[in-house]
């Protein structure tokens, strides 16, 4: 995830195991990218944690890196075999983290999978959106898990006002589910727009495009942009 002369990435010095993967930031100097600055202060001592995805944005003054982490059984590294229960437990442990100008904050701490953050920054403010599962994946059966994958995921967000992050909240209170893809932009006055393809049906043509407006951390409106038989993805 690049923004101007800086970018964020997942980085490992060794690639020997999942726990060696961390978020990192590299900057461009004289046309060359520097060796990534690896961020490790997010880790919990005694836990095997890894990073799945990162996003990054900056307005020059404010630099925000967002990522999701997961706790996994260290046996996964040793035997290479992962059963569905282990995998679900790993996903279920996923949480959202942010670094603001190098300062770490954990945004979520719950019993559902929070994954794939997207971040926007403008004029000293920021917003992060991510997908959140409806179910506790570790305690659900195969049929419910399939339903979840078909479209039960919701979109959450947290807003940074220049000092603090707001408590995570669902867009549209979670009533519209089935997050397939999403992106976010932030204007100079602190108004954010989230654009998402949503739809809880397993049929692609049932998915539609929605926009959400968030002003100073509070959701103001939701609009259904499409209503047709085409699959907006």
Where are the regions that the model predicts?
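Extracellular, repeat-based ectodomains that mediate carbohydrate processing or recognition
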Residues: 1-233
């Amino acid at each position: 995830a690049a923004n101007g002369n800086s970018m964020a990435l997942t980085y490992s010095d060794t690639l020997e195991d999942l726990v060696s993967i961390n978020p990192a930031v590299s900057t461009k100097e004289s046309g060359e990218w520097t060796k990534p600055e690896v961020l490790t202060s997010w880790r919990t001592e005694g836990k095997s944690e890894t990073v799945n995805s990162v996003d990054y944005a900056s307005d020059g003054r404010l630099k925000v890196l967002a990522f999701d982490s997961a706790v996994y059984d260290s046996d996964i590294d040793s035997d290479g075999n992962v059963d569905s229960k282990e995998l679900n437990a790993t996903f279920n442990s996923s949480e959202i983290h942010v670094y603001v100008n190098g300062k770490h904050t954990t945004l979520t701490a719950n019993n559902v999978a929070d994954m794939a953050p997207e971040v926007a920054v403008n004029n000293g403010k920021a917003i992060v959106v991510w997908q959140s599962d409806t179910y506790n994946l570790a305690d659900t059966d195969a049929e419910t898990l399939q339903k979840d994958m078909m479209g039960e995921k919701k979109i959450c967000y947290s807003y940074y006002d220049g000092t603090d992050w707001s408590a995570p909240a669902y867009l549209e209170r979670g009533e519209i589910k089935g997050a397939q893809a999403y992106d976010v932009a932030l204007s100079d006055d602190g108004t954010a727009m989230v654009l998402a393809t949503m739809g809880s049906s397993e049929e692609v043509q049932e998915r539609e495009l929605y926009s959400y407006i968030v002003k100073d951390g509070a959701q103001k409106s939701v609009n259904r942009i499409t209503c047709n038989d085409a699959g907006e993805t």
